[in-house]
C-alpha cells in the first residue's frame, strides 16, 4: 500500500485482486470494514490489513 489512510473501492479491487461485487459482499458481511464519506465508500488501510490477516488465518485452518 502507498501510505494512504483511506482507499476507494476501485483501489481495493486492485490491491486485493477482487471484483467490485466481492468487495461489497465482504463489506456487507462485516469481514471488510468501511466508512462512508458523503456518497463515497472508503476502506481504511487498517481494515485492508485486518482483512488480509483474516484470510491468512482462514487459510491456515484448512
Report each predicted region and the residues it spans.
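Major-groove DNA-recognition helix of helix-turn-helix-type DNA-binding domains
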Residues: 16-42
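A short, Lys/Arg-enriched interface patch at domain edges and termini
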Residues: 48-62
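Polyanion-binding surface elements
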Residues: 1-22, 53-54
Amino acid at each position: 500500500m502507498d501510505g494512504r489512510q483511506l482507499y476507494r473501492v476501485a483501489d481495493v479491487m486492485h490491491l486485493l485482486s477482487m471484483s467490485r461485487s466481492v468487495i461489497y459482499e465482504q463489506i456487507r458481511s462485516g469481514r471488510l470494514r468501511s466508512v462512508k464519506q458523503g456518497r463515497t465508500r472508503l476502506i481504511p488501510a487498517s481494515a485492508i490489513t485486518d482483512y488480509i490477516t483474516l484470510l491468512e488465518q482462514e487459510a491456515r485452518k484448512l
